[in-house]
Regions:
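Hydrophobic alpha-helical segments and helix pairs
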Residues: 4-5, 9-12, 18, 24
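Boundary/junction segments of secreted and surface-exposed precursor proteins
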Residues: 1-10, 162-168
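Long, polar low-complexity repeats
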Residues: 16-157, 168
């Protein structure tokens, strides 16, 4: 039976991204809530972040700066995911992106999705009218809408190689 590690502490600050605005979510970011309005863009860098409630409205956009690199978001609250992912290779994005839901609140994923969701205590509602999803999903109950297509992509982040040069 899958179990969750302890939920990270959630800060008391909230972040909203409005029309024509963008924000870069980066390693160690921590928000009580994050909302991206229609026309707003969320750039996501590799790392590990913690968010209470997340709401990505229809018409919002997401761009992974380094698709495939390990990117984990810990959630501890409600999830509404209606955004469009701007990256071309959604399979590569899915290999590096994972959400861990620590609460039992229902997660609604209506927009494009690429990544794994680990939410053993939460219900998942996936896909709406001809949406395509890439990744793996674990939830208490999972509902997949009739027009959704899911492609199995394992969480298997790419490794960043570093080259060190020495001079004698």
């Amino acid at each position: 039976v899958p179990t969750l590690s302890d939920s990270p502490n959630i800060e008391n600050t909230s972040k909203e991204i409005f029309y024509n605005e963008s924000y870069t979510l980066k390693d160690k970011d921590n928000f009580k809530s994050l909302k991206v309005h229609s026309g707003g863009t969320l750039l996501i860098k590799p790392g590990e972040m913690a968010i209470g409630n997340i709401q990505l409205e229809s018409g919002s956009k997401i761009l992974f700066s380094e698709p495939g690199r390990e990117t984990i978001i810990h959630l501890n609250g409600s999830t509404i995911w209606r955004s469009k992912t701007l990256n071309d290779n959604l399979e590569l994005v899915a290999k590096g992106f994972k959400i861990i839901q620590h609460s039992s609140e229902t997660m609604i994923v209506e927009g494009e999705w690429a990544g794994s969701i680990f939410a053993p205590n939460a219900d998942l509602i996936l896909g709406q009218s001809s949406k395509t999803l890439y990744g793996r999903f674990l939830g208490n109950n999972i509902t997949v809408h009739q027009y959704a297509t899911i492609y199995n992509v394992n969480f298997n982040p790419t490794i960043q190689h570093q080259i060190v040069m020495y001079e004698e």
